Amino acid sequence: MTVGTLVASVLPATVFEDLAYAELYSDPPGLTPLPEEAPLIARSVAKRRNEFITVRHCARIALDQLGVPPAPILKGDKGEPCWPDGMVGSLTHCAGYRGAVVGRRDAVRSVGIDAEPHDVLPNGVLDAISLPAERADMPRTMPAALHWDRILFCAKEATYKAWFPLTKRWLGFEDAHITFETDSTGWTGRFVSRILIDGSTLSGPPLTTLRGRWSVERGLVLTAIVL
């Protein structure tokens, strides 16, 4: 079992003492869900069960780093993960990757992470998930070797995951305009999600601009927003 560090490249160093992460690149044999979690996957196919179990295993590894004992990670009304008291976090999984980032609520408002295969989006998906301005800008700001459409999709997903716990409201793909910067390596960078709808939150300041990082490595795109 290999616990990797890919997601560390997209996390801010300034709050690392209040953040923890864990990631795996395969599903270790023998893992089982906690009893409270088992009903959530009772009718799931094997692939879905493995994703569910492994990503929650990652979450418990990360929580343990912050001194939180093992706890079930259930789902809210919209499918969002429900974290132990005093904690926030985000889960993601795709082919060849499962990852979790957690943080202490008194230091971190919200976390959104996403992982995707670094490959072109299926036909028709780009128009559905992007704004015309994004489709015009990204080819000019990304190196030709990068699948910028997938990076954009990954950033949109991270934006939603950071948004929803604070608002409990839907955020459509068209409701955030994302711009990107590329670092000197060409394989990492930053992005800014400008929210185009009412950003009022359940408590605290509204969400108007969310800032994150992206990285392409080992055939994967990773994005993260930490608020």
Swiss-Prot record:
The keyword Metal-binding applies. InterPro entries: 4-PPantetheinyl_Trfase_dom, 4-PPantetheinyl_Trfase_dom_sf, 4PPT_N, Enbac_synth_compD-like. Keywords: Magnesium, Metal-binding, Transferase. It catalyses: apo-[ACP] + CoA = holo-[ACP] + adenosine 3',5'-bisphosphate + H(+). The keyword Cell inner membrane does not apply. Its cofactor is Mg(2+). Inhibited by the amidino-urea compound 1-[(2,6-diethylphenyl)-3-N-ethylcarbamimodoyl]urea (compound 8918). It acts by binding to the phosphopantetheine pocket in the active site. Inhibition by compound 8918 kills M.tuberculosis. Coiled coil: none annotated. Mg(2+) binds at residues 114-116. Disulfide bonds: none annotated. Pfam families: 4PPT_N (PF17837), ACPS (PF01648). One of its GO terms (cellular component) is enterobactin synthetase complex. Its EC number is 2.7.8.7. CoA binds at residues 48, 56, 75-78, 92-93, 114, 157, 161, 171. One of its GO terms (biological process) is siderophore biosynthetic process. One of its GO terms (molecular function) is holo-[acyl-carrier-protein] synthase activity. Changing residue 170 to L/S: Confers high-level resistance to compound 8918. It comes from the Bacteria. Belongs to the P-Pant transferase superfamily. Identified as a drug target. PANTHER family: ENTEROBACTIN SYNTHASE COMPONENT D. Transfers the 4'-phosphopantetheine moiety from coenzyme A to a Ser of acyl-carrier-protein. Involved in post-translational modification of various type-I polyketide synthases required for the formation of both mycolic acids and lipid virulence factors. Acts on Pks13, Mas, PpsA, PpsB, PpsC and PpsD. Also acts on AcpM, the meromycolate extension acyl carrier protein. In addition, is involved in the activation of the acyl carrier protein MbtL and the nonribosomal peptides synthases MbtB and MbtE, which are involved in the biosynthesis of the siderophore mycobactin. This is 4'-phosphopantetheinyl transferase PptT. It comes from Mycobacterium tuberculosis (strain ATCC 25618 / H37Rv). The lineage of its organism: Bacteria, Bacillati, Actinomycetota, Actinomycetes, Mycobacteriales. The gene is pptT.
